[in-house]
């Protein structure tokens, strides 16, 4: 029988090359609150975090580039979603 997979361990193997000068995801200044709440629940990397004051904070570093937030929030919560420029982004390492 195999042991359960620990997602944090699997994600920890990935390498992230963050483009500090050009974020590939930009949250709207007047983002729809319900759309942001949905992104908090849906992001598999947990990059959308609800703060104590009820606001939602986002950090694109660590993005898996899966497109979940693009599908759920582009237009309502997100101003921009594009893949990172060449040589930047996630490098999946399976091991």
From Swiss-Prot:
Q: Looking at the record's lineage, which domain of life comes first?
A: Bacteria
Q: Does the keyword Transferase apply?
A: no
List the GO molecular function terms.
Answer: 4 iron, 4 sulfur cluster binding; iron ion binding
Q: Keywords in alphabetical order, please.
A: 4Fe-4S, Electron transport, Iron, Iron-sulfur, Metal-binding, Transport
Keyword Transport attributed: yes
Tell me which family the UniProt entry assigns to this protein: Belongs to the bacterial-type ferredoxin family. FixX subfamily.
State the protein's purpose: Could be part of an electron transfer system required for anaerobic carnitine reduction. Could be a 3Fe-4S cluster-containing protein.
Q: What is this protein called?
A: Ferredoxin-like protein FixX
């Amino acid at each position: 029988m195999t042991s359960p997979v620990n997602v944090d361990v699997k994600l920890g193997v990935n390498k992230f090359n963050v483009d500090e000068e050009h974020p590939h995801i930009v949250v709207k200044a007047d983002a729809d609150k319900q759309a942001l709440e949905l992104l908090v629940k849906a992001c598999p990397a947990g990059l959308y975090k609800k703060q104590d004051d009820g606001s939602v904070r986002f950090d694109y570093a660590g993005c898996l580039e899966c497109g979940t937030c693009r599908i759920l929030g582009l237009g309502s919560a997100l101003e921009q979603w594009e893949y990172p420029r060449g040589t930047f982004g996630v490098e999946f390492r399976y091991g």
